């Protein structure tokens, strides 16, 4: 009888634990997961490539969020929600990253987004290549080259 009472308490508890919020385990980032160093930006129309390999500009993917950050701290950082569909990376809901005063939703393009290879407020990129060490994204205007950090 005592065993039945214990099991009647423990089994529902285990069920609740296994079915609880899954935000931490949902990984929409898939192969994009982690930190990527932006090493160059190629302007497709001109063929001009800007070398950023000595800069500290990073895209970091985790769960459903993307953080754009210049590690010097001299340029604004940004947050995006993202979705991947058929090798298309769609960025939405851009925020100015400001932990001290609260993040601010962007309603207009900011020129400092260009530092990260972003040329419009909510771009869509084609994932041209991705493996454990390299990633190439293309939005039709620029091609972004990344190394996994």
Residue ranges and their predicted role:
Residues 17-20:
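C-terminal motif of bacterial Sec signal peptides marking the signal peptidase cleavage site
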Residues 1-10:
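Bacterial N-terminal signal peptides that target proteins for export
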Residues 11-15:
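Residue-level signal for mature regions of secreted extracellular proteins and peptides
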Residues 22-37:
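N-terminal helix-cap/turn-to-beta initiation motif at the start of protein domains
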Residues 33-35, 62-67, 130-136:
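Short, hydrophobic/aromatic-rich segments at coil-to-beta transitions
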Residues 42-53, 64-130:
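Contiguous, well-ordered beta-strand patches that form the walls/edges
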Residues 79-87, 130-149:
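Edge beta-strand at a domain terminus
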């Amino acid at each position: 009888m005592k065993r039945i009472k214990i099991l009647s308490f423990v089994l529902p508890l285990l069920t609740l634990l296994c079915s609880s919020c899954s935000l931490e385990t949902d990984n929409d980032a898939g192969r994009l997961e982690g930190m990527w160093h932006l090493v160059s930006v190629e302007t497709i129309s001109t063929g001009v490539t800007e070398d950023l390999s000595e800069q500290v500009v990073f895209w970091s993917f985790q769960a459903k969020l993307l953080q754009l950050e210049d590690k010097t701290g001299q340029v604004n950082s940004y947050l995006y929600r993202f979705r991947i569909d058929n090798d298309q990376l769609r960025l939405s809901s851009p925020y100015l990253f400001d932990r001290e005063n609260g993040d601010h939703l962007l309603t207009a393009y900011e020129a400092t987004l260009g530092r990260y290879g972003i040329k419009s407020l909510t771009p869509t990129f084609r994932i041209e290549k991705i493996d454990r060490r390299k990633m190439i994204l293309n939005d039709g205007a620029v091609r972004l080259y990344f190394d996994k950090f």
